[in-house]
UniProtKB/Swiss-Prot annotation:
GO terms for cellular component: cell surface; extracellular region; fungal-type cell wall. The gene is btgE. This is Probable beta-glucosidase btgE. It is found in: Secreted, Cell wall. Gene3D superfamilies: Glycosidases (3.20.20.80).
Amino acid sequence: MRGAILATAAALAGTAMADVAHMRRHGHDSFHQRRAAVAEADATCGCTTEVVTVWGPPTLIPVATPTPSTVTSEAVTTLHSTSTSTVTIVASASTPATSSSPATPKVPLPTPAITNFPSTGVYTIPATTVTVFDTTTVCGATTTELPAGTHTYGGVTTVVETATTVVCPYATVEPSGTTVTSVIKTTTYVCPTPGTYTIAPTTTTVPTSTVVVYPTPAVITPGTYTQPEQTVTVTRTDYTYVCPFTGQNEPTSAPAAPSTTAVPATTTAAVPSTSSAAPSSSSTAPASTGAVGGQMGMTYTPYTKGGDCKDKSSVLSEVANLKSKGFTHVRVYSTDCNSLEYIGEAARTSGLQMIIGVFISSTGVSGAQDQVTAISKWAQWDLVSLIVVGNEAIQNGYCDASTLAGFISSAKSAFQSAGYTGKVTTTEPINVWQAYGSTLCGVCDIIGANIHPFFNADVSADQAGKFVAQEIKVLEGICPGKDVLNLETGWPHAGNANGKAVPGASEQAIAIKSIAQEVGSKSVFFSYFDDLWKEPGQFDVERYWGCIDTFN
């Protein structure tokens, strides 16, 4: 009997679909494509037939299947060469490992304590005291609230006046098992042209408003540091709070000064000389002696109701009116609309002192550098009692605390090089000072805060002054030994109520009188006119803070 087995293998022709994977991480968009090879147009299909004939009784013939061999091809590209030394310690759970030499105990350092509160309520963080014997660079902690979108934060900000190579430490995080560890690293950065550079920042995208925590370099000097007991009122879920240490030797929160090496330039620009020397700064910051009553200053913006720049004659007459109302200072937020020239001329004629500002917008500190340059060139220091770098820049998410501290330090150096000997600060709400005082205290000569009692729903107009005084008392404990100025305060005369805080013309008059009686000598009232060019804002009050007519 003859049995035959016919084994036929047919080739299959087909197509494959291409797919595209879109990945996003830290603001960098990458596109990866995977496509199947396309058959040539002239390719044909073929068949191979194999016939095996076996004589004998029918039976099954096993067909041996060859064992496939695996060939692996790898292409290796070395981006960074790193040499590491790993020590593995294995300890028995029942018998502790012994060593011939005692292990060095871990020395606690006064790094900020990070606490996450999952729910709302009032929490108390106990006090802690740490003594440091050696100078150490550590990773501090900073938080910032980011609105939905892509943001860049952290890093070390430096200003260079020539092509320079900068060597500086920076803080970052590295994976450690299932967690991450904050570490200090050193980087070399080439600044090809003069300007402001932020070294080793972090870029991320958040779908909703998010509070992020990131490391910042800090130098801890020998001394005793105390983290005082803190009572925190949490009004939102999943809230992160950073509790800083303070001590007799306040840690330097700003990054260590980078060392620089000048890069040879092809051309050298000569610094223009001038025959007239800039007037030196003979005035000091507005007095903060603890006296109450009075009206130190008022904010002034040279904009029309439509947001355009006012003409010079309007600015001169309006600023002169401040003097007749009994004010001694005028606060200016930025250098646009010829603010320095027009308001400066009016201040000199009227005998007013100026609190001038460097406004940081959504473009960050790099976009504010031109204002630093403009102020340094203007240099009418005898008119200036204080320079405010940033107005709620952290609160608005325009930069983080570490970046702001670095920018304040570099701006102060630029002003001093131009002859300024007065004080420099920034201004933020009290919650920002509480969270980032350890970062800002070292670079600010005084504490500048914007204290608006209207935004506390439990404060009525007649209690506005007492509320502001209490807030100032709290601020005085954040940077010990430094004065506090209330650089923006007032009450709206129109809009919607916020609990007990009710806007209105009579309520505005009551609130401003209360603030003036309690802390008027250390307060700047907001603002000269209504800002009708602004968005309505929360409670529809943002446009209606004009209060010049409240003062006789």
